[in-house]
Design a protein with these regions (language model features):
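N-terminal secretory targeting modules
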Residues: 1-177, 187-190, 208, 380-381
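Short, solvent-exposed loop/turn and secondary-structure capping segments
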Residues: 121-126, 185-192, 225-229, 262-265, ...
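Alpha-helical scaffolding within the catalytic cores
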Residues: 158, 196, 200-203, 229-244, ...
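Catalytic nucleophile-elbow at a beta strand-turn-alpha helix junction centered on a G-D-S/GDSL motif
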Residues: 171-197, 220-223
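Structural recognition of the beta-strand scaffold that forms the well-ordered cores
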Residues: 173-178, 182, 212-218, 248-253, ...
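Oxyanion-hole/transition-state-stabilizing segment in secreted/luminal serine hydrolases
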Residues: 187, 219-274
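Signal peptide-proximal N-terminal region
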Residues: 200-212
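Catalytic His-Asp segment of secreted/periplasmic serine-dependent ester chemistry enzymes
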Residues: 234, 260-262, 299-381
């Protein structure tokens, strides 16, 4: 690797206040799928929302085999400034020291964290629901175990917010910034059906062009303008986009939850101009950092059952106005037309039934794949 090699995120998740989790002298083993290969790795651990310091008693990374098992010979003990244990201050992120491990693109990793102390519910754990099966041990440090004993299962990631690889100078990174439709809500667990997963597969399959990582920074419920289940898109843009290692492009799919106004607060009911202003601000901030921005059109939700009264004619007018701006905006470098990809031509306020998971809001596995297929790979040459 040349001296100009740089770190690029091969996997990420957006930190948020976890809705589950309490631990006491236990090991977590969590699965992540790499979008980009490499032979030098590091792990990022976040205590972004913790109310007090987080004690890490040990951490390992390995290639995942099946279930809670790891591939023999692939286990690597992580260190933090040369030490096996570490304390992460409230609100902080900790980077591990690099380790050597041959990682193929789209390979599954297992990151194990030993949490030696009690972490109660009021700690405010940092985590995200994962659409992956992850594992919690009985009491003890099982980071090095080839097959970790299992006390319980979880579909969340906890504390780990990124895995980076040392990559060639021309390698780029694509951030997928969005809400539950980027996070892959309702998609089949352990099937890797999110649209960023499909984008990563397509980028790898082209066998040419610039190497690109895909970092999923989707956050269920996320809005552009107001916080909900974590920071708003505008508030987290620096942390979840501009601060990510190796970022060169961002695809922004946000605005649907602004329109839906889940908490039904009149003062949070946005106009099209307010949503567009938020997207414009993201474009300015991206370009100021040398990052290209792709705007994704908002998909239809006219027959939504996930939340009663989410759709109304006024909100549809706002959606159409925002989409019209995205398709024509000089402020954006390109468009990913997810609305066109998913909508029913006969009922354009709704998704085509085959692309609808059944709640009128979230796509099916096929719909998520269709979204990943709708992105022009020429944008990343």
């Amino acid at each position: 690797m040349p001296d100009s090699a740089h770190w690029v995120g091969t996997w990420t998740t957006a930190p948020a206040p976890a809705e589950t989790g309490a631990f006491n002298n236990q090991t977590l083993r969590m699965t992540m799928r790499a979008s980009l290969g490499g032979n030098q790795l590091r792990v990022r651990v976040s205590n972004a929302y913790g109310r007090r310091p987080l004690e890490i008693g040990g951490a390992h990374i390995a290639l995942r085999d099946a279930g809670a098992a790891i591939v023999a010979g692939s286990d690597r003990k992580l260190a933090f400034g040369g030490a096996a244990a570490a304390t992460i201050a409230a609100g902080a992120v900790l980077f591990s020291d690099p380790v050597a491990l041959d990682l193929a693109p789209l390979a599954d990793l297992a990151v194990s964290l030993y949490l030696p102390g009690e972490i109660p519910n009021d700690f405010q754990i940092t985590g995200r629901y994962a659409r992956q099966t992850n594992y919690i041990s009985p009491p003890g440090d099982f980071c090095a175990a080839k097959v970790m004993p299992i006390a319980s299962l979880t579909s969340d990631w906890f504390f780990v917010c990124g895995v980076d690889v040392l990559a060639s100078p021309d390698t780029g990174g694509i951030i997928a910034l969005g809400d539950s439709l980027t996070d892959g809500n309702i998609s089949t667990i352990d099937a890797f059906c999110r649209w960023p997963d499909q984008l990563a597969r397509r980028l790898l399959a082209r066998h040419r062009g610039r190497p690109m990582a895909v970092m999923n920074q989707g956050l269920g419920g996320n809005r552009i303008l107001y916080d909900i289940r974590g920071d708003s898109g505008l508030r987290r843009f620096d942390r979840d986009v501009l601060s990510q290692p190796g970022v060169t492009h961002v695809i922004v799919m946000l605005g649907t939850n602004d329109l839906r106004n889940r908490w039904k607060k009149p003062e949070e009911e946005p106009t099209a101009a307010q949503v567009i202003a938020g997207l414009q601000q993201m474009a300015v901030r991206a370009h100021s950092a040398g990052v290209k921005i792709v705007g994704a059109t908002l998909t239809p939700f006219g027959n939504e059952t996930y939340m009663a009264d989410a759709w109304n004619p006024r909100r549809e007018e706002v959606r159409l106005a925002v989409n019209a701006w995205i398709r024509e905006a000089a402020a954006l470098d390109a468009v990913a037309d997810f609305d066109k990809a998913l909508r029913d031509p006969e009922h354009p306020t709704q998704m085509l039934p085959a692309y609808d998971c059944g709640d009128g809001l979230h796509p099916s596995d096929l719909g998520y794949t269709k979204m990943g297929d709708a992105i022009d790979l020429a944008l990343f040459e």
